[in-house]
């Protein structure tokens, strides 16, 4: 059931592309808040679009314009396609010209209603705590295990996540580097950081190298690196407030099976505040083993092959 708000003051960015059904679903949720400052962006078409893609892009724009008849928000339509390595940077930079904080949603992330209030409260509470740079609405641990990390309504991680999130202008403008110009200078310090595990160092060395070689097109890994390099904390809700639906219908980016079918649950207010502003070892170990420990993933594949029934059968035949 949707809750009606008098006015939601925190700025919201909604990035769309060519998902008309998803765009309409999420836009309705946002508009129910009566947002005072909503910015709806649509990236331009790529060259070589199919007829279906062209129609989906056109339909998405029509939906954005349709709701403007009854609601007030700013819509920005780019005529040309912006590189995936710059789109996030460009739209956030645009909004930060006039605001000191923002909530960001993409068109494949369906939020629970409480997501917006949660982000707004966290943005206000930790505004002056410069050790915290990112607020996430996605909790992959709860989404996959249906369990909470602790008895509080939020906790802290070293890993920022982007399926519904928020941040402040001062952190973003100071630390986000869309081109990773300082990577070569910072590389030695990063690799010698005793607080980082070998898997994290291997992961970022691999993917930042690919990004610098223009073999990886993205705008978010730069912020993940900035947060980890500067030892920033991310606030996460005790439950998962975001369902990613983009992995089912022609996703913009490459999906992962583990993102599918994540359980969501709305958060209750007032929040039980967490006085312990330290990294959650349990959550960070969960993400490390699932995403950042590339060697561990490789070994799991090897072990799966090694102990498969086919492999056992071959070994048995060879020994006879």
Regions found by a protein language model. Give the residues of each.
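An acidic/histidine-cluster motif and surrounding catalytic segment
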Residues: 5-104, 109-320
């Amino acid at each position: 059931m949707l809750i009606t708000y008098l006015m939601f003051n925190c700025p919201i960015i909604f990035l769309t592309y060519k998902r008309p059904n998803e765009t309409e679903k999420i836009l309705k949720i946002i508009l129910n808040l009566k947002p005072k400052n909503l910015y709806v962006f649509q990236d331009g078409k790529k060259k070589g679009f199919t007829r279906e893609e062209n129609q989906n892009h056109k339909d998405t724009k029509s939906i954005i314009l349709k709701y403007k008849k009854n609601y007030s928000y700013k819509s920005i339509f780019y005529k040309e396609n912006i590189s995936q390595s710059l789109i996030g940077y460009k739209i956030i930079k645009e909004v930060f010209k006039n605001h000191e904080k923002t909530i960001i949603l993409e068109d494949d992330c369906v939020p629970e209603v409480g997501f917006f209030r949660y982000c707004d409260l966290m943005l206000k509470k930790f505004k002056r705590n410069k050790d915290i740079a990112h607020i996430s609405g996605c909790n992959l641990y709860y989404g996959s295990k249906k369990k909470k990390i602790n008895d509080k309504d939020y906790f802290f991680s070293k890993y920022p996540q982007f399926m519904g999130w928020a941040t402040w202008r001062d952190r973003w403008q100071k630390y986000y580097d869309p081109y990773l110009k300082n990577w070569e200078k910072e590389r030695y310090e990063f690799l010698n950081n005793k607080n980082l595990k070998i898997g994290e160092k291997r992961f970022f060395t691999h993917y930042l190298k690919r990004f610098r070689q223009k073999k990886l097109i993205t705008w978010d890994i730069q912020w993940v690196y900035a947060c980890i390099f500067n030892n920033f904390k991310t606030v996460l809700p005790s439950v998962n407030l975001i369902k990613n639906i983009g992995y089912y219908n022609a996703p913009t980016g490459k999906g992962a099976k583990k993102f599918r079918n994540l359980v969501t649950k709305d958060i209750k207010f007032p929040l039980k505040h967490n006085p312990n502003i330290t990294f959650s070892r349990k959550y960070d170990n969960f993400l490390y083993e699932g995403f950042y420990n590339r060697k561990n993933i490789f070994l799991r594949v090897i072990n799966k092959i090694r102990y498969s029934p086919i492999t056992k059968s071959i070994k048995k035949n060879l020994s006879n």
